[in-house]
Amino acid sequence: MKTKCLVTAVAVLVSIAIMGAFGPAVQAKQCDRQCLVNMMQRYLAAMVKHNPQAVPFADNVKFTENGEKIMESLPVGKGLWETVSGGPTAFQIYAADPVAQAVACLVIMKEKDKDILLGARLKLVDGKIAEVEHLVSRGNVDGSRPTLQKPRPGLLEDVPPAERMDRGELIKIGLSYYDALTGEDGTYAPFARECERHENGAVSVGGTRQAPKPKPEAKPDPEAELRMKAMAAMPNTCEGQISTGTFAYITDISPRRLVVADTQKGLAVGFSMFQHDGSLKVMPIKGVPGIDSMPAPQLRFNWPSMHIFKIRKGKIYEIEALGAYLPYGAKPGW
């Protein structure tokens, strides 16, 4: 009997020792919000130093980045890892999702000493980076813009604990933005009256809109000038602009993925592929006095995009978007 009790006691002690040895290690593999943000910052720092060994990658890590013609699947250490020359600057937005073990950022970096916008996503499995997604905007990024000096405060502020929404609500609201665009109806998404959208650093609705500047050598384009005139007359609200039908030239948005929901910051982050087949010639315009139609862009292209939505009290207040050109039909890689 004594021998049996002794064996039982030893077994219990061994079990406790095993739990002590492995329990904390298992827990340590799950990152909280700050841990995820730290991992992204470590990742960016390692990239600037061209040193992939400085961060932990899973053996089967998947890494994609947009090239000139396709969304490329690359070995870690290639792509922007080879060409980045500095950053990030003061313009840094982070969103982290402990439930999904995912983190995203939108930052200004330098590539060969020129400004670029980088939207990046990491997904961790057992504490190691298993997925990396880069979306890089090159050539049309002006880091001297006031809108790219630092993020809007709302994108950085915590939501008061009593007002925080759960992940499912943030994801649903973020996805509704794409429904509003393809449905040509701004009421499909819960936009705040003060909603302001920035695209590649330019204010596209809300605030003081900034029209893209034509290149000095560009030839006059009457249709483009007509579109710009019509855009200037559009309602300057997120809901109103969409409801006019000015985005009818978007053939589809597919896929659309809400990859990060940050309940502390009230941020939802989506990666998507805007598709434009160029078949629409004229877009009917609704609700704009003096304008009932406008020419549709006659271009076939895809526009891989990242959108960060700031959501408070169930409404979208800020949108920070990044997009880049790819040929029509390009696949997203995910």
Question: What name fits each language-model region?
Answer:
Residues 1-4:
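Positively charged n-region of N-terminal signal peptides that target proteins for export
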Residues 9-21:
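Bacterial N-terminal signal peptides
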